[in-house]
């Protein structure tokens, strides 16, 4: 304020009111009202009462203001009003409307109006004498503490001194805090907090000093102790918008009884109130307790002589996390529960059931630890022994195979243990068990290794030959819960979802389930079971390459090949048997289905497929039947059982099946799949099955083969090639979880001719051979002319293609050629014959291209089934159905090492082909391990790799192979690509056509599947003439689709 107006050279002079107006305002009492209004408005709501009071004490007139400093907006409004009221009476300035619009009624004639455009702060202003802090207005903003009481507000508004108001406010706040925190303990002013004492006794210096002394002593001792404890207090946190006063917090806590008492009584909110925090805080108690625990609790315990315990854990968070984990686990468990619920009691398989339950419990425990594991374990345990359990078990087994080669053996043994009981129900159980390949079965196997297990002779036939040491089984079982479950986590989502459906239809599952289960082993991994047969050429190619590369010949991205009549029958029979039907019933149904569904390379692939329980049953049954007629019934059955794609059937049904279905004569139902993805899958399985059988017969030393397989490259050391196959299948299944076709492409080298080494492939090949040492297979392939041709190029353990012979199966030597021809021609009602017809038709109608994983497709473009004449003709042999080669399946398929169908289906279902190979061997079919056809199909490098792989097997293989499937086996062994021989069928067809189209198509077109399977149907020369083509050739052969 300026007393001398002359000192102001700038500013706007306020329009004064006329004296008459002022007098009237004084008379009406409006002057005082106008004054108050101006004070409140022009001061922007600031409380200048203390300033006005000071001025009154100085004798200055409140109305005698010489200068008004307005904000810039106010100044602008005032100028605008003055401009509008020009030439108007000044009395309008007192109008409330004008005042509201920014008008100012000046009560004096000497008021200057200024405006403040900006505000600033400067260090010198603090010490400037012109700045009177004592006259600063009381800022009214959001209270940072508790609201003032009504009395305090009244005092503040009454005009008390600012200082006295501040003191009163502090005292009132403290009193309220005391009353609040003293709910349990009334607060005593004498023992109040130091802060309160200071505020109350501010005039008393002694009280403040004592409190400060105590506080300083406490803080020194606290900081020292915490530093010695190596937990120094570096920064004091804020609580409720203000920094925590450690001394106040400590005193408040001690008054309430200390940490333990406060925590027990839940009085931390009282401590928070004592600290003067925000009353609206919802986490006051927890935050206060945690700060106390970190900053003061250790010292409190030290002062009380208590042991320095670790700070209490953050219970809420951990509890929440554990609850969430448990919830997730519980949710995961229900996912498997559908299968678990579907599980049917196995009365006749006490040991098997026990093993399954044990495996399930282990799995469940692991599953609890791992959600995916949880899913696997419940599914295996809860699933039907036959259908649900089979599928889930397969899924688990596949994973285990990845983990351990022992899994195949364990599966076989477990299945053996299970199936021995199941065979009592019927071969159906075998098939399903093979399919299921439950981890639980592995424990069973421990109890009684499949080879030694005689609970069911039929099962023994299917699996006994493939022996797995109990220790291996134990390892597999152990790995199953751990590794298998982990892997299953990836696979189970698909597998379990599909298996859940199939378990629901134990008898019906024969149709859908067989497909689904066969696919379930690996198809669910590669492709959803729900889209069988639907696959783009690229997807097919990928699938084929992946299957061959991974050894999952029967892993069809499309899903299981359409169930053969025999396979469906066998599946239904198997399920019926496991459901409780008599073994004979199961056998009959299985026989029918087996006959229709003779084990073939495709069946071998089926064993590779997840759905394998049904497929395995039929293939196993077929293999068992073949084995029986050939004299290797038990081994073949075991091999079939082992090889998931071979349908397992009761020994009777399998024996009947072998009799009924001469593998060579009948076109396997898988041939239909040979063209379409499902059909292709079946074809691969059956072909592989037959090849495995023949190879088994050829490589009688299963043990040797097993050793080789186990020692074979890429095969996890396992006592049984099947386990290896399982491991491989597990890996494959995990890989296949993603879009199967894409995965195949990714996994397989761009050049299909080049085998893509993959741990999965190797295990599959080994398993597929059914225990035949991989080296042995290689040697056999070497020995065979075809293999010799491709030896240098295709020797590669990694790509042990399932040496799958298209000739589905000849149980007996006489049956092989004769029955295969007759059955192909006659379309014998036997499952074989029926299958031959169906497959022939399918094969004729479906180009190999559609085949996903059958090397057979490579050779046969459309005429998967050759006419009997073609079978008789040597050249037809050239039409070799390059069904998914049995890399390891051939080895596994060897009589000595029948793969567990489930294990095979999990890893690769080539084991069943091995069983078929055994039957073929019994029948006298020689399986050329390698053929020039494969050489022609695969580049020299590929063939050499396969040959190298087979070189070890070559010693076991005779140079010439009488059976047309021999070349398939040779091919499978020859080219690591045989699992890749799952090379896209179209590519293979084109390649064959390019190499020697006339031979290939001539053989393919005129022949039936059975004919192809017959030994001697295709001359080895026909295969040999085909020159090996380079990888680029393969690519050119299949230009429409990327091979990688």
Swiss-Prot record:
Residues of the ARID domain: 212-304
A molecular-function term among this protein's GO annotations: transcription coactivator activity
SUPFAM superfamilies assigned to the protein according to its UniProt record, in alphabetical order: ARID-like (SSF46774)
Record flagged with keyword Transcription regulation: yes
Gene source species: Danio rerio
Pfam families documented for this protein: ARID
Domain of life: Eukaryota
Cellular compartments per GO CC: nucleus
Subcellular location: Nucleus
Family under the similarity heading: Belongs to the ARID5B family.
Name listed for the protein in its UniProt record: AT-rich interactive domain-containing protein 5B
Biased composition range(s): Basic and acidic residues: 197-211, 301-310, 337-350, 611-635, 644-660, 733-746, 816-826, 894-909
């Amino acid at each position: 304020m300026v007393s001398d107006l002359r000192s102001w050279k700038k500013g706007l002079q306020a329009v004064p009111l006329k004296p008459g107006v002022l007098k009237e305002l004084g008379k009406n009492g409006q002057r005082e009202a106008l004054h108050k209004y101006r004070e409140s408005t022009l001061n922007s709501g600031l409380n200048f009462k203390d300033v006005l009071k000071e001025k009154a004490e100085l004798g200055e007139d409140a109305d005698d203001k010489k200068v008004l400093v307005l904000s810039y907006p106010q100044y602008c409004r005032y100028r605008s009003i003055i401009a509008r009221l020009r030439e108007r009476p000044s009395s309008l300035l007192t109008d409330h409307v004008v005042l509201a619009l920014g008008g100012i009624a000046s009560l004096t004639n000497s008021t200057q109006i200024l405006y403040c455009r900006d505000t600033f702060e400067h260090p010198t202003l603090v010490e400037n004498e012109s700045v009177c802090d004592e006259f600063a207005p009381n800022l009214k903003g959001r209270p940072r503490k508790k609201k003032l009481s009504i009395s305090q507000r009244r005092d503040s508004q009454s005009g008390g001194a600012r200082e006295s108001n501040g003191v009163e406010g502090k005292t009132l706040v403290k009193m309220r805090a005391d009353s609040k925190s003293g709910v349990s303990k009334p607060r005593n002013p004498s023992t109040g907090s130091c802060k309160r004492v200071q505020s109350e006794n501010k005039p008393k210096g002694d009280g403040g000093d004592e409190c400060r002394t105590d506080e300083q002593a406490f803080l020194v001792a606290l900081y020292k102790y915490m530093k010695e404890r190596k937990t120094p207090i570096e920064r004091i946190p804020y609580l409720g918008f203000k920094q925590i006063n450690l001394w106040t917090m400590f005193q408040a806590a001690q008054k309430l009884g200390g940490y333990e008492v406060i925590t027990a009584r839940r009085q931390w909110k009282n401590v928070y109130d004592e600290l003067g925090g925000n009353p609206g805080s919802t986490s006051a108690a927890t935050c206060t307790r945690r700060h106390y625990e970190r900053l003061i609790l250790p010292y409190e315990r030290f002062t009380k002589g208590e042991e320095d315990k670790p700070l209490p854990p953050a219970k809420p968070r951990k509890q929440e996390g554990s609850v969430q984990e448990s919830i997730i686990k519980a949710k995961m468990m229900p996912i498997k529960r559908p299968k678990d619920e579907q599980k049917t009691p196995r009365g006749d398989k006490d040991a098997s059931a026990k093993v399954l339950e044990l495996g399930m419990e282990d799995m469940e425990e692991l599953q609890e630890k791992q959600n995916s594991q949880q899913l696997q374990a419940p599914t295996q345990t809860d699933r039907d022994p036959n259908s649900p359990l089979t599928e889930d078990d397969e899924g688990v087994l596949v994973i285990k195979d990845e983990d351990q080669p022992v899994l195949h053996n364990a599966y076989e043994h477990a299945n053996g243990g299970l199936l021995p009981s199941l065979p009592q129900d019927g071969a159906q159980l075998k098939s399903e068990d093979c399919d299921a390949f439950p981890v639980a079965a592995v424990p069973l196997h421990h109890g009684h290794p499949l080879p030694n297990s005689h609970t069911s002779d039929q099962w023994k036939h299917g699996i006994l030959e493939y022996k797995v040491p109990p220790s291996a089984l134990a390892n597999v079982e152990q790995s199953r819960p751990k590794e298998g479950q982990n892997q299953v986590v990836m696979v189970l989502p698909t597998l379990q979802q599909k298996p859940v459906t199939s378990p629901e239809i134990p008898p019906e599952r024969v149709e859908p389930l067989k497909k689904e289960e066969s696919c379930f082993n690996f198809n669910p991994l590669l492709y959803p079971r729900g889209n069988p047969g639907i696959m783009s050429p690229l997807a097919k190619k990928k699938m084929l390459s992946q299957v061959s590369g991974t050894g999952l010949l029967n892993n069809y991205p499309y899903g299981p090949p359409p169930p053969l009549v025999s396979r469906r029958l066998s599946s239904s029979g198997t399920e019926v048997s496991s459901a409780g039907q008599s073994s004979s019933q199961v056998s009959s149904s299985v026989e029918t289905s087996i006959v229709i569904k003779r084990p073939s390379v495709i069946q071998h692939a089926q064993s590779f497929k997840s759905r394998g329980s049904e497929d395995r049953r039929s293939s196993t049954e077929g293999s068992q039947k073949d084995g029986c007629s050939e004299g290797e019934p038990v081994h073949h059955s075991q091999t079939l059982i082992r090889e998931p794609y071979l349908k397992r059937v009761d020994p009777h049904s399998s024996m009947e099946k072998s009799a009924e279905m001469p593998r060579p004569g009948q076109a396997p139902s898988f041939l239909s799949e040979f063209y379409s993805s499902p059909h292709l899958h079946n074809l691969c399985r059956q072909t592989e099955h037959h090849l495995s059988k023949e190879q088994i017969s050829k490589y009688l030393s299963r043990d040797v083969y097993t050793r080789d397989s186990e020692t074979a490259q890429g095969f996890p050391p396992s006592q049984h090639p099947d386990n290896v196959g399982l491991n491989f299948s597990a890996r494959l299944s995990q890989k296949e979880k993603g879009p199967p076709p894409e995965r195949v492409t990714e996994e397989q080298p761009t050049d299909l001719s080049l085998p893509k080494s993959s741990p999965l492939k190797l295990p599959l090949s080994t398993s597929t051979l059914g225990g035949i040492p991989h080296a042995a297979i290689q040697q056999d392939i070497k020995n065979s002319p075809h293999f010799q041709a491709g030896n240098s190029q295709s020797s590669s353990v990694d790509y042990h293609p399932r040496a799958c012979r298209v000739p589905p199966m000849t149980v007996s030597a006489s049956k092989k050629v004769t029955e295969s021809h007759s059955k192909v021609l006659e379309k014998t009602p036997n499952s074989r014959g029926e299958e031959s017809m169906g497959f022939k038709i399918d094969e004729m109608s479906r180009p190999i291209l559609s085949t996903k994983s059958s090397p057979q497709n490579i050779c046969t473009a459309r005429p998967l089934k050759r006419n009997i004449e073609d079978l008789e003709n040597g050249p037809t042999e050239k039409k070799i159905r390059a069904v998914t080669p049995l890399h390891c399946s051939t080895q596994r398929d060897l009589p000595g090492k029948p793969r567990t169908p489930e294990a095979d289906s999990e890893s690769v279902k080539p084991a069943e082909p091995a069983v078929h190979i055994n039957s073929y061997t019994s029948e006298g079919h020689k399986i050329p391990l390698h053929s020039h056809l494969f050489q022609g199909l695969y580049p020299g490098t590929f063939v050499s790799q396969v040959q190298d792989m087979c070189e070890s097997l070559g010693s076991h293989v005779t140079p010439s192979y009488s059976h047309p499937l021999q070349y398939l086996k040779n091919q499978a062994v020859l080219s690591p690509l045989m699992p890749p021989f799952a090379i896209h069928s179209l590519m293979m067809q084109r390649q064959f056509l390019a190499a020697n189209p006339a031979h290939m198509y001539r053989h393919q077109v005129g022949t039936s599947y059975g004919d192809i399977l017959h030994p001697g149907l295709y001359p080895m020369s026909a295969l040999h003439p085909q020159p090996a083509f380079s990888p680029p050739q393969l690519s050119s052969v299949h230009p429409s689709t990327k091979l990688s």
